Amino acid sequence: MDKLIIQGGTRISGEIRISGSKNSGLPILAACLLADSPMDICNLPHLNDITTMLALLRCMGVGVTINEKMCVEVDPTTLTDTEAPYELVKTMRASILVLGPTLAKYGKADVSFPGGCAIGSRPVDIHLSGLEAMGAEIAVEGGYIRARAPNGLKGAHFVMDKVTVGGTENLLMAAVLAKGKTVLENAAREPEIVDLADCLVAMGAKIGGIGTDRLEIEGVERLHGCTYTVMPDRIETGTYLVAAAATGGSVKLRDTRADILTAVLQKLEEAGAELEIGESTISLDMHGKRPKAVNLRTAPYPAFPTDMQSQFTAMNAVAEGTGAVTETIFENRLVQVNELNRMGANIKLEGNTALIQGVPRLKGAPVMASDLRASASLVIAGMVADGETVVDRIYHIDRGYECIEEKLQQLGVNIRRVPG
């Protein structure tokens, strides 16, 4: 397995471009299955998860080509199979997103139970009960979800037991081709869901309440292809901002948006960062200062995102003062704490809260990534540590960050990848 080797002690400085959003690109690629003509999807990041989703579409018989504009052309009209096999699904949870659109368009879908990061239980019960409310017959056997709706799906009023991003996406994609009106209550409001909904509307879907927790969908008979540009990655944006803040440095990020990161930017200002917001840029400057510790609690959007918790935990480890970080979304999301403590951090766990007493510097050490965002926190920790840090099992980081070592090198970080 590849490793990242980081020589700590450099203040970040420079300018980089932010990639397209993985968490938006994956459901939008799944939504291509709903169209009856080709789709052009632009600004997709070059990431393992995106590659896996494209491989899954190809496995189903869908035509996938990269055009001269570096957009991915997806032709769903060549689909030959409504099964998503275990071999592809096991590596990525987002594979479950083909369930709703495949069932809605073709009346049947067989999707293996998904894999992905080891950050706690992410059950798909809400996906399944929502589809059943829309008239689907669902059996779970042999590790597969087997869904049938031979007469098509029917509109329904469905209240989700808890806020679920994947569940909202799956049910939204199923509802756009269902007969009649569907109302989804307690829907997730994440910007990636807004992006998916905007793409579906561009394909001819009728969706009301976009960006709220109540989505109203009037089913249509068909959806057409379109050209759509995926939104910037707000978590990648936040990660590089935190890296600059933790190192006392400065950074300018291009091709991003501040309006989808309000809670994160607020916490960075609390930490002492000076921010400058442009139309598609965000600049941060710490003026060489050590960050101040911040308290935060993760919650569904528009509150503080769970995907940014690990990075702020790493920043708090070298901040002035004491910060409390409470994780309410995923139960195993504080696993990076043990690795940070091995680097000299002073972090105590109390249930789902990390109490972090900042220290001036960490010490380089060999550490191991356990999930995508925890691995990003260890890279940040390596930047603020004395000496060399070796981050192992970085296949996690390659699932969510495009060219991370190249981008950090552009910002002056002494980092290199060593093949396993």
UniProtKB/Swiss-Prot annotation:
Its EC number is 2.5.1.7. GO terms for biological process: cell division; cell wall organization; peptidoglycan biosynthetic process; regulation of cell shape; UDP-N-acetylgalactosamine biosynthetic process. Keywords: Cell cycle, Cell division, Cell shape, Cell wall biogenesis/degradation, Cytoplasm, Peptidoglycan synthesis, Pyruvate, Transferase. Disulfide bonds: none annotated. The keyword Endoplasmic reticulum does not apply. Cell wall formation. Adds enolpyruvyl to UDP-N-acetylglucosamine. This is UDP-N-acetylglucosamine 1-carboxyvinyltransferase. It comes from Teredinibacter turnerae (strain ATCC 39867 / T7901). The gene is murA.
